[in-house]
Amino acid sequence: MTSPFVGSWSYRSFHNNPDLAVPFDALRFGAGTLALTEPAFGQVSGTLGGPGWSLALAGHYTYGNPNHARFQGSGDIDSEHWVYDYVGYLVPAWPDGVNQTPAIVGSVIRTLPHSNGQAAAGFVASFIAVRQR
């Protein structure tokens, strides 16, 4: 049985700002293509990236209610080493849902600082990844 996380996903992450007056576009943290594979049962690997950047991913998934995956992304971007950790939950299908597209929702934490201290370690954002058709 193939992991439900395997495939290509449109990834978007957001600043966790509760102020509804903040424009939606100002909440953007990152966006890219999340491509996940299953090198062995219970494992995930792949890439997350966009124009000019890419992180190599490695981690694991667990079946449950809901299914969840935890993985780390790392890569050298503009001569700096980036490391982020992710936890995501596969959104359960609604019994009466119409044309529901699979989605992963979760959070990401910046594990190592980068950009000369402008991007501090420990920053947390929320993300959604929607399966590409």
Walk through the language-model features, giving the residues of each:
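N-terminal glycine/threonine-rich, aromatic-flanked beta-hairpin/loop signature
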Residues: 21-60
